[in-house]
């Protein structure tokens, strides 16, 4: 038995990939074991914007959810990532064809830094929807000022420091991600933008 109030399990990749199938089956069984009201499925999808035709496409999300449902999992919340704001009529379409309440179709428009994501999720009421699902009453208003401060430092600080990383895989963007993040955190703590 675990003493945690929440356990977050992320399964990356694309729904239906052979590598992730055992994990998808494990969370399906886990949900059955603990009871549906004690497990929440959040599905993150890309809602592409096509510049040539100036339109947002919901079909990839619909197909992704269809594939997930074929594996026995109905998402409770769908987070729709897009480079543009998703109009309400498109969100309603996703809600209808994916069988998810419209208030649980959450958009997240691409941000300049990952540290803006909590602010974006709060703006879309993701935190409220999660608490509501588990029937937890929020006792206080969320204080996003620390996230706003971090975002401001990253995006607007004039002072910067240049650091070179020497390594075999420096051309791969995520090869030294943990080192990159550690240096970014050090920069935030010292009001500096870190240029790698």
Regions found by a protein language model. Give the residues of each.
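N-terminal beta1-alpha1 cap of cysteine-dependent amidohydrolase-like domains
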Residues: 1-5, 11-196
